[in-house]
Amino acid sequence: ISTFASYLCGSTENGMFCPTWVWAQGNVYRGEFKKEEWLGNVALSFNKQIGIHRISAEASSEYRKLTKTAFWVYAKGIPTNDFGYDNLGATAARPYGGTESTYEDQSLASVMGSATYSLLDRYSLSVNARGDGSSMVGDNNTWGFFPSVSFTWDMKKEGFLANIKPLSMLKLRTGLGQAGNLGGISAYTTMNTVRQTGIVPIKSSPTVTLGMVRNNNPDLKWETKTTFNIGADLGFFANRLMLTAEYYYSKTSDMLYAYEVPVPPFAYNTLLANIGSMSNRGFEIGLSVQPISKKDMELNINMNLSFQSNKLISLSGNYKGMSMTAADITAIGSLDGAGQNGGDNNVVYQIVGQPLGVFYLPHCKGLVKNENGSYSYDIEDLDHNGKVDLSDGGDRYIAGQATP
């Protein structure tokens, strides 16, 4: 049995003072930010050898809580420089939006278990499972369950390979498992959220107005990534020459994406929902050589080679019987300044059916001299419709991938 607990606390104070004799004329700012994190973990482990059988197991639970608080004030017109930013009450005005406070509270509870069975120290089967419950997802899907299983075969210990001297290790391994992700969710993403939008007079009294900035989605849940892998590890000459190879395929489902929705029936014009999917596949090879191995000196040479393919499968689907669609072609990165004919400088796009983040560009054949002696770009009409359109249409082509 093992236990672990920790508490982390961080606090930051910021202050700014602009003297009355500079352009800002007595503007002051004061802010305080605090972050607290609690973590507790309890684990139980078991290990038993019975003849040719070996069983090991572990179970653990963990709880993590994170709170963030912030408060800041911006004010104008301090009467004397002697106060600095230590007497905000002496300022003449606090403009709208100059006083803010925020609070964020999120928690995560996890239960994990794993068991491994080994026969003859040759065949090994491992089963793992974890359940994660987060305060950040919807009330209908607080918990996510993520199992995995893997198998390893130590072939070198088989009789038909035992006498092959140069071969010191040969293992085959494969696995299938799931993992969860909440990267696109903040503490209150699943709730209706309002924010101040301005000040209006009501009965001669200034009143702050509020506006909706987020729809609630009680069905929001974990993104799920399912991964399959198969590989081999080979060692030669007492493992001074090592070779590893692995193929993997993963698919992320229930991807989080913000969709445009009608108002009404929704209170706000976008909704975060779990609909999209994406895949990754690849092959990795590793080579390790130890040409020198002496008591006082050792030389290791490592080389790696990998191939990876990514594909955005879909961004459209249904939410409670309502069709949710996203554009098949969406600009996500641009260049500033001159450089493209027409001033449309979007260059990086997400395109359904393509890797996530591709260069989607017009094709320039060169420069054309105009009648007045100036030059302009000669942009190719890729869709052959008689005109060049540099919007996200047919006169662009996929020129490469933005991510390595």
Mark where each language-model region is.
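Extracellular/periplasmic, surface-exposed regions of secreted and cell-surface proteins
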Residues: 1-4, 8-9, 17-18, 23-338
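Short, 15-30-residue, compositionally biased linear elements
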Residues: 33, 371-374
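Glycine-centered small-residue hotspots that permit tight backbone geometry or close packing
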Residues: 229-231, 353, 366, 386
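Hydrophobic beta-strand positions
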Residues: 247, 367-368, 379-380
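C-terminal beta-signal and terminal closure region of outer-membrane beta-barrel proteins
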Residues: 275-280, 327-365, 369-372
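Acidic, glycine-anchored loop motifs typical of Ca2+
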Residues: 373-375, 380-400
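C-terminal substrate/ligand-recognition segments
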Residues: 404
